[in-house]
A protein has these predicted regions:
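Structural register within alpha-helical repeat arrays
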Residues: 169, 203-206
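Residue at a conserved register position within TPR or TPR-like alpha-solenoid repeats
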Residues: 173, 207-210
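Conserved Class I S-adenosyl-L-methionine
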Residues: 22-42
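Soluble small-group transferase modules, centered on the S-adenosyl donor enzyme superfamily
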Residues: 40-188, 193-198
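Conserved beta-strand signature within the Rossmann-like core of class I S-adenosyl-L-methionine
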Residues: 7-14
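A short glycine-rich, Lys/Arg-flanked "PGG" loop and its adjoining helix->strand segment in the class I
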Residues: 1-7
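Alpha-helical junction/boundary sensor with strong preference for TPR arrays
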Residues: 193, 210, 229-230
Length: 234
């Protein structure tokens, strides 16, 4: 913590597909003990290798969608943002999960990772050989921490936050190999936030996959939904 510049932040990437839930809890417990201000974010862009990130700072962490929109007018920054699928500030808003105040009670009794007790050094390699359900279980733990309140991002459109739970549900369905459930969850996300870039991109990708597989009817149905008002799936 003392190595950060004033207002500086530290980001710890979490490869959920390589972490058992116990290891994830140990990391969160240690991180929230060190940093007074913490946020948990997740990436769920239809990936079989889901990622999360813990962001910590000595001072409150602020995100500003309007500032990001201004930076997106810079062609260099825009190209970089598009490279990671983040060319809309609302892409950022739907990735927010929760803050340290909500995480600390969950991991209060979980031992810290320390230099003399480097738990992850010994437990993480086990995941390499026992990967079934690994990413799904860790992502489910993260999803259970979802704060129902809008993400603390100034200038972001509140409606997009309503899609977060459904986007996580879709990612969990993908990891479980449940295509129909994944599709329903993305349709529900789009119904909650029709402008959601994440939901629209995922549905467009699913439509392309279904078309390549010869399921033209489903592909056409998704394409029609993307071009019309959307209702939640039944």
């Amino acid at each position: 913590l003392e190595h950060l510049a004033p207002g500086g932040i530290f980001c710890q990437w979490l490869p959920l597909h390589q972490l058992e839930v116990g290891d994830l809890e140990a990391i969160v417990s240690t991180f929230t003990a060190v940093f007074p201000h913490v946020q948990l974010w997740v990436a769920y862009h239809r990936s079989l290798t889901p990622l999360a990130a813990l962001v910590g700072s000595a001072s409150p962490i602020a995100a500003d969608a309007d500032a990001m929109r201004a930076r997106l007018r810079d062609p260099t920054f825009l190209a970089m943002a598009r490279g990671v699928g983040m060319d809309d500030p609302d892409d950022l808003g739907v990735l927010y999960v929760t803050d340290g105040d909500r995480l600390r009670p969950v991991v209060r009794d979980v031992p810290w990772i320390t230099d003399d007790r480097p738990r992850i050094e010994f437990s993480a390699p086990r995941g390499y050989f026992h990967q079934e359900g690994l990413g799904r279980d860790a992502l489910a733990w993260v999803a259970a921490r979802l704060d129902p309140a809008p993400a603390p991002i100034a200038g972001a459109r509140p409606a997009t936050f309503e899609a977060r739970a459904n986007l996580l549900r879709a990612q969990l369905a993908l990891l479980a190999g449940d295509g129909p459930a994944e599709l329903r969850a993305y349709l529900d996300a789009l119904a909650a936030a029709p402008a959601s870039p994440a939901a629209r991109a995922a549905l467009a990708a699913i439509a392309a996959e279904r078309r390549r597989a010869g399921d033209v009817s489903t592909a056409d149905g998704i394409t029609r939904v993307l071009g019309s008002p959307v209702r939640a799936s039944e």
